């Protein structure tokens, strides 16, 4: 199950019915038609639970008995598509939800009453996500929440609602409609709180923390490996120089303070500078050991 599906299942599992949520779903996934008996309303979704949720909402709020139809897509995904259809009281429903325009279509913006009321805004965002929302799996490490809209002004309205909850929402216009999106992990987690998906929020945070911990460990391991590589490289250079000194002039001709360091470096090529300092007969600081090693390298370079 994808993370997006898990979020939607959590929301639908709460069995909350809301007119504002219904308004968002109809606006984003619905279409109005005309028949001999008047207006018809069709709402399309690939989510069977959402289709059932719509059926219950129509019945609960308007005593409308809708019909759930389904067919199989013919594209590569071959998903089952559900259409919740009704030709009962459509005009009354659209008027009550402030959805109908003067041309027997759906209003493209968001009603001011929703924009100005926090609880209405929460419910509307919940419906918008159920209809056309998606969240990239947090395991990917590339955080993105998107809500797609047919109309730019609706996408901007969604962004305004999100911004009222202090979320950094942006809008991107596309060839077919527009998308409102969040890219910060903290904003996505806060959005999940706004729509009441608390379990999904906790799951998102857990995955985020685990991933960041793994990344921190990897960075630490990489840094340690790089430090070891640098230590070995510097050690081998010094050992080669000590061998050169030994062959040409003999280690016994080095100053006494350099002889012990030279012998230790040859005996322990894997030692860090600190380990060399700790192994000297007279304790020395790391900078003191480095100074002596530089002297040895300089002597070798001059031979």
Swiss-Prot record:
Pfam families: HTH_WhiA (PF02650), LAGLIDADG_WhiA (PF14527), WhiA_N (PF10298). One of its GO terms (biological process) is regulation of sporulation. Residues 272-303 bind DNA. One of its GO terms (molecular function) is DNA binding. Transmembrane segments: none annotated. Belongs to the WhiA family. NCBIfam families: DNA_bind_WhiA. HAMAP family: HTH_type_WhiA. This is Probable cell division protein WhiA. It comes from Streptococcus pneumoniae (strain CGSP14). The lineage of its organism: Bacteria, Bacillati, Bacillota, Bacilli, Lactobacillales.
